[in-house]
């Protein structure tokens, strides 16, 4: 029996979904012969993905991949006589006899429909059919599990929440001196609330003594708005847009930050929170969605819609060394409960029900 794993949607640059999939593979390979439908990944048998359907091809690539998933993927499934298809994204063949387990990261497109309006048919018609036909659904947080039931009516007994983890060999305390910059890591979509973060930073009484580093790929839809806001507030010299930072450079940037500020309006998980805690960096994050699940009592939780609260939290960390020390210590302890070994073991337990 071969476990067929659909990774046809992976991007060459690491994202949350890519990180999740690549960290699960070693745990699955230990127990099952595996074949990956993906770009070449060293150490694994891979069925190549046609070049015209990769995520780098944009909307056309996504469309080609969905068509390929419906017609070509079932043929691979039958040829291998697989008992189950596992996909770390809610994409699977619908009109076939494929049995599949999928992972769902979040319901953000349904919570912020205006942002994702071009993809409305995908999220309103295709995704719910995949979820309904799946043998089982894995979610990365209790928040996402509840959202799936809320938006799609999927019964709770068909869903298992298995949290993400972080790379312990990569993200850890480096004992570097703290520099005077606040850090954000993530994309620039409006639900990430970067505009609120910029406004909160500008309201710091002594903002000129600090910098705000925004790490994440630039986006022609949103970057101009953010840079215009920075200019209007007169803080151009204090705000740095660092675009995409190589994975190997992230630990140093996180370790040296005075704090990670992650004020999202909604998240399926919020991996940067764990990575910052592992580095001993204090965390300010939202009191909404999955973020309290991830942060526990080891972070300052703020109302992301309240700019004043964000400013006050940043000011408190900037001026109170005892608070920084306490949050650093609590974060290092708290993040130890998350590991890819636990995530992998729990995932194997779900898959084993259908193999």
Q: Which sequence ranges carry the predicted segments?
A:
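Carbohydrate transferase catalytic cores enriched for Leloir-type hexosyltransferases
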Residues: 1-355
């Amino acid at each position: 029996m071969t476990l067929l794993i659909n990774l046809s949607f992976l991007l060459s640059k690491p994202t949350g979904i890519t990180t999740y999939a690549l960290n699960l593979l070693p745990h699955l390979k230990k127990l099952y012969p595996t074949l990956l439908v993906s770009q070449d990944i060293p150490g694994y048998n891979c069925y190549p993905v046609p070049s015209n359907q990769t995520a780098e091809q944009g909307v056309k690539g996504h469309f080609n991949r969905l068509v390929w998933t419906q017609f070509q993927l079932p043929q691979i499934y039958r040829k291998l006589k697989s008992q189950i298809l596992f996909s770390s994204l809610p994409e699977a063949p619908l009109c076939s006899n494929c049995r599949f387990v999928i992972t769902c990261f979040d319901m953000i497109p349904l919570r912020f429909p205006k942002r994702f309006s071009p993809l409305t048919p995908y999220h309103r018609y295709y995704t719910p059919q995949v979820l309904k036909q799946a043998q089982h659904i894995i979610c990365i947080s209790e928040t996402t599990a509840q959202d799936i039931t809320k938006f799609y009516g999927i019964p709770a007994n068909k869903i298992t929440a298995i949290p993400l983890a972080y790379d312990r060999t990569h993200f850890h305390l480096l004992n570097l001196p703290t520099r005077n910059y606040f850090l954000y890591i993530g994309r620039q979509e409006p639900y990430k609330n970067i505009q609120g973060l910029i406004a909160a930073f500008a309201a710091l009484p002594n903002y000129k003594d600090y910098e705000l580093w925004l790490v994440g790929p630039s986006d022609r839809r949103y970057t101009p708005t953010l840079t215009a806001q920075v200019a209007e507030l007169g803080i151009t010299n204090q705000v740095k847009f660092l675009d995409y930072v190589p994975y190997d450079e992230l630990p140093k940037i996180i370790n040296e930050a005075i704090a990670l500020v992650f004020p999202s309006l909604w998240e399926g998980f919020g991996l940067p929170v764990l990575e910052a805690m592992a580095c001993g960096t204090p965390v300010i994050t939202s009191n909404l969605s999955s973020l309290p699940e991830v942060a526990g009592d080891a972070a300052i939780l703020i109302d992301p819609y309240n700019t004043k609260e964000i400013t006050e939290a940043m000011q408190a960390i900037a001026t109170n060394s005892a608070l920084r020390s306490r949050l650093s210590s609590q974060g290092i302890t708290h993040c130890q409960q998350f590991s890819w070994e636990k995530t992998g073991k729990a995932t194997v337990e779900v898959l084993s029900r259908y193999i």
